[in-house]
Amino acid sequence: MATPRLFRLKAEVAPAPSGPIAQSLPVAKIRVDTGVFHLDQLYDYIVPEKLSDSALIGVRVQLPFGGRETEGIITSRVAHPDRAGELKAITKVLSPHAVATEATLTLIENAAQLYCCNPWDLIRSAIPPRVASVDKSLSVVEAARTTQRSAASPIFHTFSPYLPSHRQMVDLVHGVKRNGSVLIIAPDEHDVDLLVGVLSAAFENVFPLTSSLSREDRYRNYLELQRFPLSIIVGTRSAVFAPVNNLATVIIYKESSIDHCEVRSPGWNTSTIAKLRSDNEGVSLIYTGFSPSLNSAYEIDHKKMKFVSQRFQVEARAFSPSEGALLPGRIFSEIKKALNNGAVLFLAPRKCSFVRSLQKCCALRLWWPFSCCF
């Protein structure tokens, strides 16, 4: 028979006292990572005096919520709470560096309302995870400065069909960089690498910001954005939320690419977020590509977006098929000659289709019939 064990009394663990309350603005409104979709409001917490100097807007903090310790971001400091009753206190400041500005937090709040989601779902995409070693290696600086500007109509800048698009970005960035920092959003990491390569050769303070970087490099670059008054940031989707110091221009590179759409919930789009940011902060917004997307074409047709394009002349020739061959034999000599002047594009219709008449093309307008193209 087993010997019964003695009962042990469980000792109640009381929370450690937080000490005296901060004398100036003792209440912090915090965006808490609740883990629950419908608990998306701001919560009031007491700021202890010992944390008052470091508990600033945009700083990560640890706090008690629902019987556990979780993470939050301070959105503001106020003198009095919105509700009566006893408030819990912030446990500790996780990082001395501000990872978001007031403008960034406002952008996330507006985007959450637009996409009907919990703001923390956007924060996970917008702000990279904390790395303690990087926090210790960098000195604390003032949060990124946001210069209020008058918002202008967005612009669509068309690329020349003769040159690689990433090389054409050098002249475009050179024209807008005199106004302040530039944020470029590219569809994928390959485009980011190409852009960083050509821009680093022409400008200083060029920072990549993608998920393909190591956690240390991504977090370090994210914090470095707030240290330079004039910089160029090249990143993928999540970089559209980055707190850039003295931001003047946002450029959406290849804006018709499907990679600008976030595949995870809530499925936001960089063009939409960039438009919200342009309206909130008054930064210039430039879309680029060889041709506008359907949404941009609608904005251009209704005079809501300025269309900037040079006149390009492309020589087009048609060759009839010979002996059922997909590509006629005499076409190859023409291709070799044209390669001396630039890139060559040739199109071959399917067997069941017809050769389109470019003079009668309706540009695939969304109405029926399409007989004008044949």
Language model feature labels by segment:
Residues 1-356, 361-364, 368:
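Accessory, non-ATPase domains that flank or precede helicase/AAA+ motor cores in DNA-metabolism machines
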